[in-house]
Curated annotation (Swiss-Prot):
<dbReference type="Pfam" id="PF00133">
    <property type="entry name" value="tRNA-synt_1"/>
</dbReference>
<dbReference type="GO" id="GO:0005829">
    <property type="term" value="C:cytosol"/>
</dbReference>
<dbReference type="Pfam" id="PF13603">
    <property type="entry name" value="tRNA-synt_1_2"/>
</dbReference>
<keyword id="KW-0547">Nucleotide-binding</keyword>
<keyword id="KW-0030">Aminoacyl-tRNA synthetase</keyword>
<dbReference type="InterPro" id="IPR009008">
    <property type="entry name" value="Val/Leu/Ile-tRNA-synth_edit"/>
</dbReference>
<feature type="short sequence motif" description="'KMSKS' region">
    <location>
        <begin position="610"/>
        <end position="614"/>
    </location>
</feature>
<dbReference type="InterPro" id="IPR015413">
    <property type="entry name" value="Methionyl/Leucyl_tRNA_Synth"/>
</dbReference>
<dbReference type="InterPro" id="IPR001412">
    <property type="entry name" value="aa-tRNA-synth_I_CS"/>
</dbReference>
<dbReference type="InterPro" id="IPR013155">
    <property type="entry name" value="M/V/L/I-tRNA-synth_anticd-bd"/>
</dbReference>
<keyword id="KW-0963">Cytoplasm</keyword>
<dbReference type="Pfam" id="PF08264">
    <property type="entry name" value="Anticodon_1"/>
</dbReference>
<keyword id="KW-0067">ATP-binding</keyword>
<feature type="short sequence motif" description="'HIGH' region">
    <location>
        <begin position="41"/>
        <end position="52"/>
    </location>
</feature>
<dbReference type="InterPro" id="IPR014729">
    <property type="entry name" value="Rossmann-like_a/b/a_fold"/>
</dbReference>
<feature type="binding site">
    <location>
        <position position="613"/>
    </location>
    <ligand>
        <name>ATP</name>
    </ligand>
</feature>
<dbReference type="InterPro" id="IPR002300">
    <property type="entry name" value="aa-tRNA-synth_Ia"/>
</dbReference>
Length: 833
């Protein structure tokens, strides 16, 4: 039987594309543009897994489709190659992280090319290349000049095992680090911060301008966390000190019965009484060992210590004890809260635990039993009594402003971005600290500030990066003789990925980040595909940097990515025991369609789970390509289900995709291809062109492939295949299975040219209309025959044809036809006596 020999055909076409630079980005200014971007990978030692190609195949289908539609297409690939894993590996093995990274990139590139993706490799970038990070550093110097990069002594998330501080976003809900799962403790350190908060309102508002999944927009909105309320100033009794509280409910001020400061609040030590000093100091020590997420966990037991001091409630003059508690964060709001236990669950639980006063100020509920968190008419609230929420807030804010103890305020949950890492393998921060106490950015002509090569990359142990050990690199002298010391912190991995999509546009430019006219031509990115796990971090950081560059006049658009799409996860085959525990696949025995634990004999339930080394269910694309071919992998991953769904990997599904491609190969290579159109496939072909075109545009790749299958089935029923329909079908197939598409195109045309730029087929609406219809002929309501007749045949003609049919003639022989009921295009019912 004829079949598609992927081992011969796929390498042949990959070599053809490389030799001919088939996918070089188009530069014809008269053509429309299409910029298709993948989230570039971190080149790990493990190489690609089958989850990577899902998103890459989707952008590749769109890129091939748009090229055929006459677009200039920019479809690049590169490497997000700085980061902790390479450094950790280097420390464990003694190898240079640069060498390790280069080897991994070579392996990734080999795997990617084996899958037939149409990348323009002339635009390949690598975040660890000095010619690339020169511009990462340049952006940092611009942030510094604008006051958006600054140094601060801040409590950081310190991970001893990693020897570095990490951002809030990199701490998991259980209080461990995203990288490695290590304990995270709070520790005050000198750090570089980026003032992303200055862009909070724009980052929020401009989400309305992009075509992104609403779920991702909501995650960003929640992270930015805008809230409107008031700042209220509380004086500390018997002192000249005060503190400010931000509250979204200033109308409940009459119900504030105590105040809580974050343990790190600057006021704590100075207001704590001698009797409470030891307890406060011990509580502060314990709080420093917890992450922000662990501290704010709603389910955890409430803890706190009284400082011995009192605040004065400005609205009624009452004394309020001042406590410290770890659920209040110094980094959020003002680091202090007014507690209204009658109407806040956390404050109520705290008040109950420590026997603090609870005063209801809203009608409804029983505050002895639980906090009342609904709206209600104000009570026990002096001049606010009888008012609803909105009126009471307005009146209280006016009172606060009149009396000078508060004012209206918009607050954000978003914090400034902790930007420095105490590690070696990252971009050096281009700042010099001089002995006269000043700091300056490295001038543009001296960039890049190259990361020095060293064998000693272990953390210094002092909280500084390993760069602090390299005296020759570290120490500098100015022309006027003033000595200085280079910044030893490096940038986080997020730096290089915050702007890489811009460098693809002009990757070899030594004079500027990218040419302005080219940026104007290509921005914004038309489609950006990647995992939803980057919803907050990477996407928010990239939007921030883009807006800064927009303000500097570097980029012409407010937003970087016009359309975002998150592909689903490809899950691995896995098994669970009766407790729900996952069992590694090499411990499972399959017998008679059931699954059993090899060691215990227990019958297991098959349950898809995320692919992992520990479960031994990771599928390597190299193995799939070897056995089935790259086109099979591509078609299978696109046919599994909707692109955004998480679906389990299936060997049977892979075999089904392969059988389909073999059927396509046989159809084109063994069917008689003819120059005359019989018309038999008109409707099937034009329906397929219309459907596949629309479904690619809508990224419904699974239904597009289903439509291709429908056409193959229809074509196989005919004795011959019209050559124009054969060519058109191969063009529709080519974005999904490009190697087979090229091979079949040569069989049909012998052109020696790639199919890539052949104009995309179009459909003819008139061919979508059925010219014939099937008519049911009944006698006394029972079906006796079915006829195929011309559509819209008249009642008289339909009656004549029905009565003349052989079967009907036999049924009515010798009987009198009393009546004939005709429903055009549907049925003829004959009534006989």
């Amino acid at each position: 039987m004829t079949f598609y020999n992927h081992k011969a055909i796929e390498p042949k076409w990959q070599a053809f594309w490389a030799d001919n630079h088939t996918f070089k980005t188009g530069t014809d200014a008269s053509k429309p543009k299409f910029y298709a971007l993948d989230m570039f990978p971190y080149p790990s030692g493990a190489g690609l897994h089958v989850g990577h190609p899902e998103g890459y195949t989707a952008t590749d289908i769109l890129s091939r489709f748009k090229r055929a539609q006459g677009y200039n297409v920019l479809h690049p690939m590169g490497w997000d190659a700085f980061g902790l894993p390479a450094e950790q590996y280097a420390m464990d093995t003694g190898n240079d992280p640069a060498e390790f990274t280069a080897e991994n990139i070579a392996n990734f590139k080999r795997q990617i090319n084996a899958l037939g993706f149409s990348y323009d490799w002339d635009r390949e970038i690598n975040t660890t290349d000095p010619s690339y990070y020169k511009w990462t550093q340049w952006i940092f110097t611009k942030l510094y000049e604008k006051g958006l990069a600054y140094e601060a002594e801040v409590p950081v998330n310190w991970v001893e095992e990693l020897g570095t501080a990490i951002a809030n976003e990199e701490v998991l809900p259980d209080g461990t680090s995203e990288r490695g799962g290590y304990p995270v403790v709070r520790k005050p350190m000198r750090q570089w911060m980026l003032k992303i908060t200055a862009y909070a309102e724009r980052l929020l508002a401009d989400l309305e301008e992009v075509d992104w999944p609403e779920s991702i927009k909501d995650m960003q909105r929640n992270w930015i966390g805008k809230s409107t309320g008031a700042n209220v100033t509380f004086k500390v009794k018997d002192t000249d000190k005060d503190f400010t509280v931000f509250t979204t409910r200033p109308d409940t001020l009459f119900g504030a019965t105590y105040a809580v400061l974050a343990p790190e609040h600057a006021l704590v030590d100075s207001i704590t009484t001698a009797e409470q000093a030891a307890a406060v100091a011990e509580y502060k020590r314990q709080a420093s060992l917890k992450s922000d997420l662990a501290r704010t966990d709603l389910a955890k037991e409430k803890t706190g210590v009284w400082t011995g001091a009192y605040a004065i409630n400005p609205v009624n003059g009452k004394e309020m004890p001042i406590w410290i508690a770890d659920y209040v964060l110094a980094s959020y709001g003002t680091g202090a809260i007014m507690a209204v236990p009658a109407h806040d669950e956390r404050d109520w639980a705290f008040a109950k635990q420590f026997n603090l006063e609870i005063i209801p100020v809203l009608e409804g509920g029983n505050v002895d039993e639980a906090a009342y968190t609904e709206d209600g008419i104000h009570i026990n609230s002096g001049f606010l009594d009888g008012l609803d929420k909105a009126c009471a807030i307005t009146k209280m804010v006016a009172w606060l402003e009149e009396t000078g103890v508060g004012h209206e305020k918009v607050s954000y949950r978003l914090r400034d971005w902790l930007f420095s890492r105490q590690r070696y393998w990252g971009e050096p921060i281009p700042i010099i600290h001089w002995e006269d106490g000043t700091s300056t950015a490295v001038p543009e002509q001296d960039l890049p500030l190259v990361l020095p090569v060293t064998k000693d990359i272990r953390p210094s142990g002092t909280g500084e990066s390993p760069l602090a050990n390299l005296t020759d690199w570290l120490e500098v002298t100015r022309e006027d003789g003033v000595k200085g010391r280079r910044e030893t912190n490096t940038m986080p991995q997020w730096a290089g990925s915050s702007w890489y999509y811009l460098r693809y546009i002009d990757p070899h430019n030594d004079e500027q980040l990218a040419d302005k006219d080219l940026l104007k031509q290509w921005l914004p990115v038309d489609i950006y595909i990647g995992g939803a796990e980057h919803a907050v971090l990477h996407l928010l950081y990239a939007r921030f940097w883009h807006k800064v560059l927009y303000d500097l006049g570097v980029v012409p658009t407010k937003e970087p990515f016009q359309k975002l799409f998150n592909q689903g996860m490809i899950l691995g085959t896995s098994y669970r025991d009766h407790r729900g525990a996952l069992v590694a696949t090499d411990k499972v025995d399959k017998r008679d369609g059931s699954f059993f634990h090899m060691e215990t004999g227990e019958e297991l339930e098959q349950a898809p789970a995320k692919m992992s080394k520990s479960l031994k269910n990771v599928v390597n694309p190299d193995d799939v390509v070897e056995q089935y071919g790259a086109d099979t992998l591509r078609v299978y991953e696109m046919f599994m289900g909707p692109l955004d769904a998480s679906i389990a990997w299936s060997e049977e599904g892979l075999e089904g995709a392969r059988k389909f491609l073999d059927r396509v190969y046989r159809l084109i290579t063994t069917k008689e291809i003819v120059a005359e159109n019989s018309g038999a496939l008109d409707k099937a072909y034009h329906e397929t062109v219309k459907a596949v075109t629309e479904q690619i545009e809508g990224m419904k790749f699974n239904t597009a492939i289903a439509q291709l299958m429908i056409f193959v089935n229809a074509a196989n029923k005919e004795d011959e295949l019209y050559v124009a329909y054969a060519k058109g079908f191969v063009q529709l197939l080519a974005p999904f299975a490009p190697h087979l598409g090229e091979e079949l195109w040569q069989i049909l045309t012998a052109s020696g040219q790639s199919i890539s730029y052949v104009a995309w087929p179009t459909h003819d609406d008139s061919k979508l209309v059925e010219n014939d219809v099937e008519i049911v002929v009944q006698i006394k309501g029972k079906v006796k025959a079915k006829l195929v007749v011309a559509k819209d045949l008249s009642r008289e003609e339909l009656e004549k044809v029905a009565l003349a049919h052989d079967k009907i003639q036999a049924e009515i022989a010798g009987k009198e036809v009393a009546k004939v009921i005709v429903v055009p295009n549907k049925l003829v019912n004959i009534v006989v006596k």
